[in-house]
Amino acid sequence: ATSASTFSGLKQTNLTWLDLSYNSLRDVGNDSFSWLPHLKYLSLEYNNIQRLSPRSFYGLSNLRSLSLKRAFTKQSVSLASHPNIDDFSFQWLKHLEYLNMDDNNIMGTKCNTFTGLVSLKYLSLSKTFTSLQTLTNETFVSLAHSPLLTLNLTKNHISKIASGSFSWLSQLRILDLGLNEIEQELTGREWKGLRSIFEIYLSYNKYLRLTSNSFALVPSLQRLMLRRVALKNVDISPSPFRPLHNLTILDLSNNNIANINEDLLEGLENLEILDFQHNNLARLWKRANPGGPVNFLKGLSRLHILNLESNGLDEIPV
């Protein structure tokens, strides 16, 4: 354990970097770091911390980067031993920009888990939670005053995104929801409030059913990754991708897609990379196709990388 006196001998120093990883730490005592006001980088990776409290990080007002990767106890599956992050545990970290909490078994977020992180730009929560199956409009409410740019939520067994789950994150640029178990129809309201979004990564999820409004609220989107998500309803009209005039990269690979319309990619004049491999598009380019070949690539004047591998194509329309 650390206590308020552990680092008192360093009070005359200007220490900026402290690595406490692999120390079997179980307890971060109140005011442990109060002697280190110049600290900018702190690593507590690979420890057995059982609890963070509102004064665990007191005094670290200049900290820029904090890694809590595998920092918490993982010893038992019983509910009682889940590590606990008290509300306001991060409240003193006014200048923190980077926070990594990957690979832990924390129950979920509370309404003030991240309160006070008013400079936070990068938050990685990959394989962090045990009970985050549903994202709601309260999950990230404590980030409402954080200028967050990147949020990594991979490998959390997330199965549903409710309306407005990210509505607090108006500056977010990159949202990574890959490698989860999301299984739902995308109404579009899931992305409400993401006014600055640049990339949404949804690849490797269970089942996504599209609607014409699936991406209507994120016209700023430039990269959309939908690889291996058992994608359904791609052939609806108007196309789900129609609002995405700024899109440059679209990945629809490994979805066994067989039916699409000519207007699937209509209006995507900025599209540069299209990954469409491992689908079932063979029939669409055959002369014998009812209604003739489906020219779904028309108008894509900026396209310079096109992957149609493993689609069974044996005819290319003239």
Regions found by a protein language model. Give the residues of each.
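Extracellular leucine-rich repeat
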Residues: 1-318
